[in-house]
């Protein structure tokens, strides 16, 4: 990703997120202090922030399931285009923690951010477009062509101007506290890791495996969809 930000390359970055199922990472290395956990999360966060900070535009192409860490990455891109039937959300808030990157507030506003994060429910791609979480949704068989068409249009513009116009919008987000909120998000995730439900989920994973533990966690929520 950093290499593709070279000023010598006239190319736009298309970041594809496609999950057949939710992917979860369980750290079973032993207990960490709150401070150690927060620092670990911030170190990982700095790598993801390259998407936000790099000069060239990055388009997120979302199909399938974009859940948990997938949303951390996709929402740092400059524009998000998804399939109508994609599913976007952070179901780990039901038992494990909080998003370690937080752009939800800026893209959805406070009420819908809370609606999704307080339940772990997901949005279909078409609904995500209606609410402004993504730029646009299209039928799945049109997704790649739609993203390529936008990338081709961006490629007609001088890279210095692309960088300038991306940067001023992102600086506006920074003036609204976006960079500070990311650090606070890492700390809130570390705080969430102290919840009794996280330890219970870890035990379920050790006993039943990740798939069954996830099904047990999600069973009370039905189809897990939030409908505008």
Residues of each region from the PLM?
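Generic alpha-helical structural signal
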Residues: 42-45, 144, 148, 166, ...
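C-terminal alpha-helix plus adjacent terminal tail
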Residues: 2-24, 124-125, 156-228
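Short, charge-rich amphipathic segments
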Residues: 38-40, 78-89, 178, 212-221
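An acidic, glycine-rich surface segment that forms the CoA-thioester-binding/catalytic face
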Residues: 11-63, 101-102, 214, 218-228
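Short alpha-helical segments used as structural interaction elements across diverse proteins
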Residues: 37, 45, 111-112, 163-164, ...
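Crotonase-fold acyl-CoA enzyme core
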Residues: 49-162
């Amino acid at each position: 990703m950093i290499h593709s930000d070279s000023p010598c390359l006239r190319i736009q970055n298309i970041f594809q997120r496609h999950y057949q199922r939710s992917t979860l990472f369980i750290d079973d290395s032993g207990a960490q202090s709150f401070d150690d956990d927060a620092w670990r999360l911030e170190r990982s966060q700095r790598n993801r922030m390259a998407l936000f900070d790099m000069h060239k535009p990055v388009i997120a192409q979302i199909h399938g399931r974009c859940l948990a860490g997938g949303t951390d990455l996709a929402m740092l891109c400059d524009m998000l285009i998804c399939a109508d039937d994609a599913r976007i959300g952070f179901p780990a808030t039901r038992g494990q923690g909080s998003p370690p990157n937080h752009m939800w507030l800026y893209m959805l506003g406070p009420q819908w951010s809370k609606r999704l994060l307080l339940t772990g429910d997901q949005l279909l791609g078409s609904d995500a477009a209606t609410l402004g979480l993504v730029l646009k949704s299209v039928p799945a068989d049109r997704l790649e062509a739609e993203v390529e068409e936008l990338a081709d249009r961006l490629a007609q513009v001088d890279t210095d101007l692309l960088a300038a116009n991306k940067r001023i919008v992102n600086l506006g987000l920074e003036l609204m506290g976006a960079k500070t909120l990311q650090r606070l998000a890492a700390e809130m995730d570390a705080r969430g890791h102290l919840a009794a439900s996280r330890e219970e989920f870890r035990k379920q994973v050790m006993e039943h495996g990740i798939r069954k533990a996830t099904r047990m966690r999600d069973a009370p929520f039905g189809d897990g969809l939030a409908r505008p």
